[in-house]
Regions:
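Catalytic Tyr-X3-Lys loop
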Residues: 1-19, 34, 38, 55, ...
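Active-site loop-to-helix junction immediately N-terminal to the catalytic Tyr of the SDR YXXXK motif
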Residues: 2, 48-56, 68, 96
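Substrate-binding pocket helix/loop in short-chain dehydrogenase/reductase
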Residues: 3-8, 93, 100, 104
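C-terminal substrate-recognition "lid" of short-chain dehydrogenase/reductases
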Residues: 19, 30, 34, 112-141, ...
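Active-site helix of classical SDR
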Residues: 22, 58, 66
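Alpha-helical segment proximal to the catalytic Tyr-Lys
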Residues: 27, 71-75, 132
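Residue(s) in the substrate-gating loop at a strand-loop-helix junction
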Residues: 42
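Active-site loop immediately N-terminal to the catalytic Tyr-X3-Lys motif
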Residues: 47-53, 75-76, 111, 129
Length: 147
């Protein structure tokens, strides 16, 4: 069960926060006719996660925000992209047992969990000059778990 307060908090942190940051950053980017906006969703934003409805909804909303902003801000030289990580070894995984992690790795086609560095490397590339023709995309960093 999710309370209305939990629902709203999840949306505020994962969707409204991103919207507010975009609102603050965009005027300067539009003036300069250049910029990169990167959002971080989740594979659950792409597929939905059982017992994760509020998280999945917030992350799916972030994907929608990314795509709409890409269309809106492209003419101003601003690209907007999203990274949707899968099972990544972070503090969010701290409560998982070694057996749970092994089972998740076994479900993943590449046979292991991802690292934060793998997500970060993609974000660095998308923030760079060589990514100027990439916009409105959702990049799964999930070892093939979501294909």
């Amino acid at each position: 069960d999710i309370t209305p307060e939990e629902w709203q908090h999840m949306l505020d942190v994962n969707l409204t926060g991103a919207f507010n940051l975009c609102q603050l950053a965009l005027p300067g980017m539009i003036r300069r006719k250049a910029g990169r906006i990167l959002t971080v969703s989740s594979m659950w934003g792409q597929t939905g996660g059982s017992c994760e409805v509020h998280y999945s909804a917030a992350k799916a909303g972030l994907i929608g925000l990314t795509k709409a902003l890409a269309k809106e801000e492209g003419p101003s030289g601003i690209t907007v992209n999203c990274v949707a990580p899968g099972v990544i070894e972070t503090d969010m995984m701290a409560a998982f047992t070694a057996e749970d992690k092994a089972a998740l790795a076994e479900e993943t086609p590449v046979g292991r969990l991802g690292s934060a560095d793998e997500v970060a490397e993609l974000l660095v590339f998308l923030a760079g000059e060589n990514a100027g023709y990439i916009t409105g995309q959702v990049f799964g960093v999930n070892g093939g778990l979501v294909i």
